[in-house]
């Protein structure tokens, strides 16, 4: 009886290991946008940008995740970048749909004359 249970467990574990090895890790596409705002921007203008960007997930179905924050690095290597937004998509088609979406175009109009510098970085990450 003990040998039978051991063999069944071994087969189940082997099957799980094979299934896991055959399945590719699921990835998501992260779209990172960082800003340095112009020195003459008011706190209200910066908040307008934050609110406009933060509203995009409700307007663009392709967005599956959204995060934002301000720089708190102690390293002093941010080159003046103060705000970061991370938008997550399931694939490149989602990012492409977002970039040409009217809500994105409207957001760009809000931010374009308030930013001094923008850095955009896209990468594939393991889905959680």
Residue spans of the language-model regions?
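Alpha-helical and His/Cys-centered functional microenvironments
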Residues: 6, 35, 108
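Bacterial N-terminal signal peptides
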Residues: 6-16
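C-terminal structural segments of small proteins and small subunits
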Residues: 92-100, 105-112
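C-terminal partner/receptor-binding element of secreted or periplasmic proteins
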Residues: 111-120, 124-128
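Short, structured active-site "lid" loops
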Residues: 86
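N-terminal compositionally biased, intrinsically disordered segments and leader/signal-like regions
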Residues: 4-7, 21
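Short S/T/G/P-rich N-terminal loop/turn motif that feeds into the first structured element of a domain
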Residues: 14-82, 90-97, 123-128
């Amino acid at each position: 009886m003990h040998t039978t249970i051991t063999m069944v467990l071994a087969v189940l574990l082997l099957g799980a290991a094979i299934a896991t090895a055959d399945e590719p890790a699921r990835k998501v596409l992260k779209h990172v946008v960082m800003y340095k705002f112009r020195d003459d921007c008011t706190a209200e203008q910066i908040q307008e940008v934050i609110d406009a960007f933060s509203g995009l997930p409700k307007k663009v179905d392709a967005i599956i995740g959204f995060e934002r924050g301000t720089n708190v690095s102690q390293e002093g290597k941010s080159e003046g970048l103060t705000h970061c937004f991370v938008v997550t998509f399931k694939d490149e088609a989602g990012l492409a749909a977002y970039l040409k979406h009217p809500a994105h175009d409207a957001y760009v109009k809000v931010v374009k004359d308030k930013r001094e510098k923008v850095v955009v970085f896209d990468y594939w990450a393991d889905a959680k």
